[in-house]
Amino acid sequence: MYFINPFKGLRPTKENASSVAVSSTDHLSKDSVLDHKNNNSWSYLNVFGEKDNSKSKEQFELMKKKSILKKDKKNSFYIYKISTGNHSQVGIVGTAKLSAYDNLHIRGHEEIFFERSQKRMKQMDNLNAQIGPIYAVYPDNKQLNDLSLIHI
């Protein structure tokens, strides 16, 4: 796994996870998004979905200050599984070196959505954090496959 590394994640505490977590906005109606934001002040949508970056930053900092989000003490990989209908996909979250991207060891999914990638870059710059995944594809890797199978 030469191109990804573990890191100390900043994530919701177990007590707050259900308040913070939200389905992909790609699968939510505008009304559902607004309802979720208005009825749950700790919803991730209040950080991720804001058009005004100053409001996003303010909410993000408040969530850290109130310990809604806490930084893990040790470096880790994070494994997730997304299921929609009859399809499931497993992912591994880690940090990647830009050189791996530059050398085409990984390829970003967001590249195909120029406007979305520009929005994400502004968001990362504003928050000094990457708060959503950047999907990347990589060559088949037995270590990653085994790791995900063990923990899912």
Task: Please report, for each region that a protein language model flagged, where it lies by residue.
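A cross-family signal for N-terminal binding/gating loops and helix N-caps
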Residues: 1-149
